Amino acid sequence: MQNMEELYELIKQRKATPKKGSYTDYLFTKGLDKILKKVGEESTEVIVAAKNPGDDELTYETADLLYHVLVLLVERGVSFDQIKQELAKREGKMSDYKDRPEIKNL
């Protein structure tokens, strides 16, 4: 695997032709709620890792989060092209972050 799009395609293939006993198959078998729970857990782990010194833990946890987000996209039928198109629409645009409420408790 070389990039995120290839990983997405591999996950999509695994959903279409499950490899029994694999973690990916386990997630798809358990369904959307389990996948969402994992995305939430991994997001929290990325936040904690980012607060710690060093990059190894952050790198590891970010890889986990990206994998689980890709599983979520496949489960929901959202194509990688849809994500790329959305990112392309945003390229060069100014953010409206000032209009968003501030997060006070993190």
Curated annotation (Swiss-Prot):
Class of this enzyme: hydrolase
UniProt pathway: Amino-acid biosynthesis; L-histidine biosynthesis; L-histidine from 5-phospho-alpha-D-ribose 1-diphosphate: step 2/9
UniProt superkingdom: Bacteria
GO BP term, pick one: L-histidine biosynthetic process
Primary subcellular site in the record, as a coarse category: cytoplasm
Entry keyword set: Amino-acid biosynthesis, ATP-binding, Cytoplasm, Histidine biosynthesis, Hydrolase, Nucleotide-binding
InterPro entries in the cross-refs: HisE, PRib-ATP_PPHydrolase-like
Annotated catalysed reactions: 1-(5-phospho-beta-D-ribosyl)-ATP + H2O = 1-(5-phospho-beta-D-ribosyl)-5'-AMP + diphosphate + H(+)
EC number(s) stated in the UniProt entry for this protein: 3.6.1.31
Subcellular location field: Cytoplasm
Key word Protein biosynthesis present: no
Signal sequence annotation: none
Entries under Pfam families matching the protein: PRA-PH
SUPFAM superfamilies linked: all-alpha NTP pyrophosphatases (SSF101386)
GO molecular function list: ATP binding; phosphoribosyl-ATP diphosphatase activity
Gene3D superfamilies: MazG-like
NCBIfam families: histidine_hisI
Protein family: Belongs to the PRA-PH family.
Protein name per Swiss-Prot or TrEMBL: Phosphoribosyl-ATP pyrophosphatase
Organism: Lactiplantibacillus plantarum (strain ATCC BAA-793 / NCIMB 8826 / WCFS1)
